Structures are given as structure tokens and as C-alpha cells.
Amino acid sequence: MKTIFTLILALFTLSCAPKSAEQTQSDKYTVEGTITVSKECDVEWLTRYEEKYIKALKERATVEPAECDVMFFGSSSIRLWKTLKEDFAPLTVVNRGYGGATLRDLHYNYETVMAHYKPKAFVFYCDNDLRTKPEIDIPVGELFDLARMLFNRIEQDYPGVPVYFLAMKHCKRREAIRDRQAMYNALMKEYAERSSNQLIYVDTCTPLQTADGEIDTTLFVEDNIHLNAEGYKRWVEILRPLLIK
């Protein structure tokens, strides 16, 4: 059977609902909202990490306590943050990041990622929607809309809980899209400043650069995308004072 999964953002409500089979032509996942965005993705693509990462997230949610100080979620830069608990002690933190995450499949996996947790704050990072691969890449404006939808949903589900948005980092592997990353960061910064006190923009991009604005490659591992221990220390220096007050 073929179906379309639809994520609808109303003025004050966000919910998921399947469309009937006679309305569909192929397996698609559609994101729509009052901020006027519609994005269809193959369900097969959205579920590509079900066995590799999502299944583990589901299993961990059954044994981890619901109460926590901070939930970190997003893509592999979160998942690979091995010193997360030590870096933010004595806070209780949970790591809900998974490799390859995009805003598109984070909408699809929203309930799984959030699960039963009741955090006092969120920290979000994801940089996989802007790519040099045309089969994955989406326009900056479309990504901005998807981000707004995600944060609007969190505000409805977790009223008053701050969300720290980590700016998209520049890296050598994706240097060709640096201007687009900067554009997205600028849009998110302005949106956070204008929207509400719940979304806080954190510049985690500039600290990874040299004094002349170039990418500091000494802060990255060999793939030139992910941070090494020194790179994460730069993030901790910025984030820790915000989370531990």
C-alpha cells in the first residue's frame, strides 16, 4: 500500500495524519504549514537510518529517565560528542543526536527523538540539509521554513523551555557552500531575535575560525566535517555559561 504522511502546522497546533490511499501516487512525506512550506520526501529516504540509529534511540528511551536538564539533539556532531556528560556536569544531559540527520527526517522522527523526555532546555545542531550533492541539497529558504516549523512545534509541546540553536559550522569538506551556510545562520539569528525568548541563537561557527576568518582545520578530524576534542572544547566554552547559570 502506498501512503503520504502529512505534518501540518496550524496556528497553535501541530499534528501528524496519514492521507487516504486513493489520494496518493507514491510513498511521500509532506511537510505543510501556515508559514507556507510544502516539502515531499520519499519515506524510504526518510527511514534510511531506522536500523542504524533510530532503533537505538527508541531502545535508550525505555531505560533513560524522563527528567533531564538538557536534551542535545540533531545530527552527528551531536551524536559524536563523546564527552557531553563530563563537559556539562553537574547537569543531567541526554544525547538524542543521530548520524546523517536532516531537518526533513527530524520532522518525521520527531516523536522518536523527543520520546518521553522532559528537559529543562534543548540544544540543537544539524548541518546536513545544505550539501553539494543535488539529490540531498535543498534551498536555504526551504531549510529556514523547515527550521521554523520544528521550533514552533517545540514551543507548542514544551512551552517556556529554551532552545539553543547552534549555528551551522563552516568546514573544508563543504567550503563550496559556505556562503549558503552563512545565509542560513543569518536568517536563524534574526528569527531567534524577533520570534521569542524561547529560541536562542548561539554563534558556534566563528570560534572555529582563525583570526582572519578562515576555517581552523586543526579543530576538525580527518573527514574535515566533524570536530575533534579541541573543536568541542570551543563549543563548551560558549555553551556551558549559557546552560549553567
Predicted regions: what they are:
Residues 70-73, 93-97, 121-126, 162-167, ...:
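Structural recognition of the beta-strand scaffold that forms the well-ordered cores
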Residues 67-83:
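Catalytic nucleophile-elbow at a beta strand-turn-alpha helix junction centered on a G-D-S/GDSL motif
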Residues 9, 89, 118-119, 159, ...:
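Proline-centered flexible-loop/turn and helix-kink motifs
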Residues 169-245:
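Catalytic His-Asp segment of secreted/periplasmic serine-dependent ester chemistry enzymes
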Residues 78-87, 92, 105-144, 168-172:
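Oxyanion-hole/transition-state-stabilizing segment in secreted/luminal serine hydrolases
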Residues 141-166, 183, 187-201:
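Charged, glycine-enriched surface loops/patches
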Residues 59-70, 107-116, 152-155:
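Short amphipathic alpha-helices and their capping/turn segments at secondary-structure boundaries
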Residues 1-70, 86:
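N-terminal secretory targeting modules
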